[in-house]
């Protein structure tokens, strides 16, 4: 037998395996690697594979007590990034046994927990993950999914409409409830707590829940439609979060909300399990995502966070607008929107999808378009996102010159007009403005909204390019 050979050896001798055939059960990752000058890409890719699986900086005696071949991550392919001098895409395969079942927390701790501070790399970005069915099947996934949500709400054949209540901080619970009522009464399906509304001195959570529940029931009785308000259950401890979710269920409201990145995946998964068991829909806000996903060469792409959310659980998630005030490049946004909604997504590098992803039968998540959108955007949004989406107009509802309810009316009229035009076979991309103008002729509320926002544009070149 060979004696134990101490010392430091190059990662690529063990962890760079270009001949490796990936298994159907492997978790595959695509990293954008920017090595330090003088570090060959193979070594950098192998270093990532090693440090995010079984390796450490030196050979250890206890390596002899396990089978590295069975457990090590492998960098199995490296390709240069077109148009970038020193960037490479490194593909890494991880054996399934490295991960705890049903834990997004553990998956991220393993894959991205340690390697991002690595000295041999100037920068590192996780672009995409392939989650094998063998792993995704250990998760509950979204509490209900798209079809069940439509059945609960009895709303079919169109996108859903929402509105974030503004000013986001400072309203009393009673005035907050009033704004909720006016929006729902005007024709919206949902209103939403802002992500930073938790339980502050000016409005404690229990007061808000009570007033919002009253607003929901009153609006439902008057419109004959099912209404909802995303009650933000995010809290400082998991116990407090569950307490809020339980109170929401006792009030009989249809939906609660959670900030899944700031709240953490462990808390989110617990809440998702509770929501399925108790018939609550779960709206997910992605506060803090840009800290992780905005840099092009470091961090994680949002499509990875979106996949993680589908596993951890949520029925809605914010996913950019393509047209409003926040970032989002069209093809790339549509790429992860499909990853949220569809069962099977083909690899398509033009949309940033590095791997074919088969979700089997995991329920889908509704993408939420929100941020700086208004009635003039409605045709584009209807065309880009299709029926299975939630369109959220915060300022685009509450900023209406006549008040909240007319603002809601304007949005609902615009949406119904766009859906009808599309169903009649008209081209929303080309005739969008015309469709809105026609509808405005018989809806004074819409006409007023059109007048206010006719000049507003948030035009900056998008940063998320391929």
Swiss-Prot record:
Record keywords, A-Z: Calvin cycle, Carbon dioxide fixation, Chloroplast, Disulfide bond, Lyase, Magnesium, Metal-binding, Methylation, Monooxygenase, Oxidoreductase, Photorespiration, Photosynthesis, Plastid
Domain of life assignment: Eukaryota
Sites of N6,N6,N6-trimethyllysine modification: 5
Positions of substrate binding: 114, 164, 168, 286, 318, 370
MF terms (GO), sorted A to Z: magnesium ion binding; monooxygenase activity; ribulose-bisphosphate carboxylase activity
Active-site positions on this chain: 166, 285
Binding site for Mg(2+): 192, 194-195
CDD domains on file: RuBisCO_large_I (cd08212)
Post-translational modification, as annotated: The disulfide bond which can form in the large chain dimeric partners within the hexadecamer appears to be associated with oxidative stress and protein turnover.
Localization per Swiss-Prot or TrEMBL: Plastid, Chloroplast
Pfam families: RuBisCO_large (PF00016), RuBisCO_large_N (PF02788)
Catalytic activity annotation: 2 (2R)-3-phosphoglycerate + 2 H(+) = D-ribulose 1,5-bisphosphate + CO2 + H2O; D-ribulose 1,5-bisphosphate + O2 = 2-phosphoglycolate + (2R)-3-phosphoglycerate + 2 H(+)
Family, as annotated: Belongs to the RuBisCO large chain family. Type I subfamily.
NCBIfam families: PRK04208.1 (NF003252)
Job description of the protein: RuBisCO catalyzes two reactions: the carboxylation of D-ribulose 1,5-bisphosphate, the primary event in carbon dioxide fixation, as well as the oxidative fragmentation of the pentose substrate in the photorespiration process. Both reactions occur simultaneously and in competition at the same active site.
Miscellaneous: The basic functional RuBisCO is composed of a large chain homodimer in a 'head-to-tail' conformation. In form I RuBisCO this homodimer is arranged in a barrel-like tetramer with the small subunits forming a tetrameric 'cap' on each end of the 'barrel'.
Protein name in UniProt: Ribulose bisphosphate carboxylase large chain
Species: Betula nigra (River birch)
Gene behind this protein: rbcL
